[in-house]
């Protein structure tokens, strides 16, 4: 079975060392309770119709969640993610073409004071 697209995006990020130092999770964020932990959560976010033998566009949301009091590090990683994808949009045959859409949104804070960016990506893939 082919992994779902959000899992393939997670693998692409890991191969590019973009998840280093972060706990990666799929679908939902499960906080460990340790305020020094950082997270990346990969989840599907819609897309175009998926048909056999035709390409489709998949949307994936990536939540980048920082450690409490370490806003600069999470902001720097978000910039690194965007730069890596801009420079390597077709580097993984399991993805096809990936691009950021929506830019970098304003971050929000969790109740605990963690900075959260919600990045969106469009992946154009067909076999």
Where are these regions (language model features)?
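Charged, amphipathic alpha-helical segments and their flanking helix caps
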Residues: 1-23, 41-127
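Short acidic low-complexity segments
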Residues: 25-34
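N-terminal, polar/charged subdomain of small-to-medium soluble alpha/beta proteins
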Residues: 37-39
């Amino acid at each position: 079975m082919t992994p779902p697209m959000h899992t393939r995006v997670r693998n692409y990020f890991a191969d590019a060392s973009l998840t280093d130092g972060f706990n990666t999770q799929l679908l939902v964020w499960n906080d460990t309770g340790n305020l020094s932990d950082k997270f990346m959560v990969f989840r599907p976010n819609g897309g175009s119709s998926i048909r056999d033998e035709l390409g489709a566009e998949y949307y994936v949301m990536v939540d980048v969640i920082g450690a409490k009091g370490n806003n600069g590090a999470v902001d720097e990683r978000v910039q690194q993610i965007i730069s890596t994808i801009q420079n390597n949009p077709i580097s993984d045959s399991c993805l096809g073409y990936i691009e950021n859409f929506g830019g970098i949104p304003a971050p929000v804070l969790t109740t605990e004071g963690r900075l959260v960016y919600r990045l969106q990506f469009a992946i154009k893939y067909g076999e």
